[in-house]
A protein has these predicted regions:
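Acidic/glycine-enriched connector segments
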Residues: 4-172
């Protein structure tokens, strides 16, 4: 059974975030501009995988824009219950909790940790996205690499903020 919130995001244009944990928050202004561009094109729902680094910074940018764009929705996609306890320090855990509290919907992939849980979370992000905003270095042996490759196979629109200049790309 779908909730009203789930039905709303199934009918909207959705953007998922994926990126490395070593994200440089100095790029937040670029990130904000890209999110603004997607909003101007009618994208209203943003999915965040809730990892430290890029994911959490991206969710915070979306939440900061909700004052100007009340139609925005943030979905926190949590890999498993208690994921916040896996954060590297108290600051990340607190930022994580604030995002979960402010999110319009929280999707929990599993009640407990298992070896495939991050891949399943990444699959959920790609399967429910029309576009991807990423911070991807090109290292294919990472969760971000897996997610980007999967998004490319699905021909999703993609913006990579890793380089100093970025462009919107289409794959297919």
């Amino acid at each position: 059974m779908y909730t009203f919130a789930t039905i709303c995001y199934l009918c909207s244009l959705n953007v998922a975030f994926t990126g490395h944990r070593n994200y440089l928050e100095v790029k937040n202004e670029q990130l904000r501009k890209v999110v603004d561009q997607f909003i101007s094109e009618g994208y209203t729902t943003f999915l965040c995988g809730m990892a430290e680094g890029f994911d959490i910074a991206a969710a915070e940018v979306v939440l900061s824009l909700k004052t100007d764009y009340p139609q925005l929705r943030l979905l926190s996609v949590i890999p498993f219950e208690g994921h916040d306890m896996a954060m590297p320090n108290a600051e990340w855990a607190e930022r994580y909790r604030r995002i979960v509290e402010a999110a319009d919907e929280v999707v929990t992939i599993s009640q407990s940790y298992n070896v495939n849980i991050y891949r399943l979370r990444n699959d959920y992000l790609v399967d429910n996205a029309d576009a991807i905003i990423c911070y991807y270095s090109g290292n294919v042996r990472t969760g971000t690499g897996y997610t980007v490759r999967r998004a490319m196979k699905k021909c999703l629109r993609m913006v990579n903020l890793y380089a100093d200049s970025y462009q919107i790309q289409f794959f297919g």
